[in-house]
Amino acid sequence: MNMKKGVSQLTLQTLSLVAGFMAWSIISPLMPFISQDVDISPGQISVILAIPVILGSVLRVPFGYLTNIVGAKWVFFWSFIVLLLPIFLLGQAQSPGMLMLSGFFLGIGGAIFSVGVTSVPKYFSKDKVGLANGIYGVGNIGTAVSSFCAPVLAGAIGWQNTVRSYLIILSIFAILMFFLGDKNEPKVKIPLMAQVKDLSKNYKLYYLSLWYFITFGAFVAFGIFLPNFLVDHFSIDKVDAGIRSGIFIALATFLRPVGGVIGDKFNAVQALIIDFVIMIIGALILSLSSHIVLFTIGCLAISICAGIGNGLIFKLAPSYFSKEAGSANGIVSMMGGLGGFFPPLVITFVTSITGSSHLAFFFLAIFGVIALITMIHLNKKEKAIRI
C-alpha cells in the first residue's frame, strides 16, 4: 500500500469533512441570532434544527456506494458545489419555510461522512484502519468550529454575513478536491442489490447500526440542541452557550481516534460494553438533576463515551463487512445521523408536556441498556467462535 498517498488523501478528506460538517451544523449556533430577526415558534425551531439531519443521514448510503464506484474525489467535489446553493439561500432567509428548505439541503454536508469511511481504509493495512478512520472522524470537529466561531462572527458582522462567509470555504475545498483528490482510487463494483441482499442477512449490521444510532446520534443531537437549551434553561449568554456546546463537540471529536486505537489494540466489543456503561450513567445523571454542575458532568460523560464509541464502531465495520464496505458504512452512518434527528424533537415534546426534559434523557439511558444487551450477546458469540 502507498503510505504517502494514504496520508495525503486522509489529510485532504479529513479537512473536507471539517468543511462539510461546518456547513451541516451552521444553523444551530446561529439560531439564537436568527430567532431575533425571524418570527419562529419553539416547535418550528426544533424542526428547523433537526431538518439538516434528514438528508445528511439518508444520503449516506448512496454516497458510500458511489464512493466505491467513482471515488471519493468526485463525490466530495460535487457535494461542495451543490452545497453552495443552500448556503446562499440560508443567507437570504427571512421565513421559517426558507430556513427549513435551506436546512434540508445542508444535509449534504453531513452525508459526506460516509465518503471517507469508505475511501480511507483502502489506503491502509487492517491493523491501521481503526486509527485511520478515527483520524478521519476528527473532521466532525467542523461542528465545533461552527459552534465556537459562528456566534462570535455573528456578533461582529451579523448572522447573514456569517453564513455567506461559508461560500468562500466551500469553494476553496471544491477546488482543492478537484486538483488534489485521487483519481486512481481503487474501485469496488459489486452490484448494489447483491450487497444489500448479503448485508440484510448479517445481524451484525443491525447491531452496529443501533450502537451508532446512539453514539453518533448523541454527538449530533447534543450539538444541535445544546446552544438553545443552555440559553433557555440556564440563562447562559448566547456566545457562552456556543462555546460550551463547542467543547462538547470537540471533546467527542478528538476522542474518536482514541476509540479507533483502542479497537486496534484490544477487543472492540468489550471496550464498547465499558463505554456504554459509562454513557448510561451520564444519561441517568442528566435525567435526575437540573443543576448546572451535574448537567455539565453528565454532558461530559456522554461526550467522552460518544467519541470513543464512534471510533470503536468504525473499527468494527470494515472488519465485519470488507466486501460491502461502501453500503455497510453508508447504512451504519445513516442510522447514526438519524439518531441525531429525533432527540431534539423528543426533548421539545417531553418538555412541553411535563415541563421538564428529564424524561427525554432517561430514554437515552434505556436505549443504552438495550444496546448493552446486544453487545453482550455479540461478545458471547465471538468468544464461542474463538473457542
Swiss-Prot record:
SUPFAM superfamilies listed in its UniProt record: MFS general substrate transporter
Keywords: Cell membrane, Membrane, Nitrate assimilation, Transmembrane, Transmembrane helix, Transport
Induction / repression: Positively regulated by the two-component system NreB/NreC.
UniProt-listed GO biological process terms: nitrate assimilation
Entries under Pfam families matching the protein: MFS_1
Role summary: Probably required for nitrate uptake under anoxic conditions. Also possibly involved in excretion of nitrite produced by the dissimilatory reduction of nitrate.
InterPro entries reported in the protein's UniProt record: MFS, MFS_dom, MFS_trans_sf, NO3_transporter
Top-level taxon in the UniProt lineage: Bacteria
Primary location group: membrane
Subcellular location: Cell membrane
Membrane topology: Multi-pass membrane protein
Taxonomic lineage of the native organism: Bacteria, Bacillati, Bacillota, Bacilli, Bacillales
MF GO annotations: nitrate transmembrane transporter activity
Coiled coil, from the record: none
Name of the protein in its database record: Probable nitrate transporter NarT
tRNA-binding as UniProt keyword: no
Organism: Staphylococcus epidermidis (strain ATCC 35984 / DSM 28319 / BCRC 17069 / CCUG 31568 / BM 3577 / RP62A)
Family: Belongs to the major facilitator superfamily. Nitrate/nitrite porter (TC 2.A.1.8) family.
A GO cellular component entry from the record: plasma membrane
The keyword Oxidoreductase appears for this protein: no
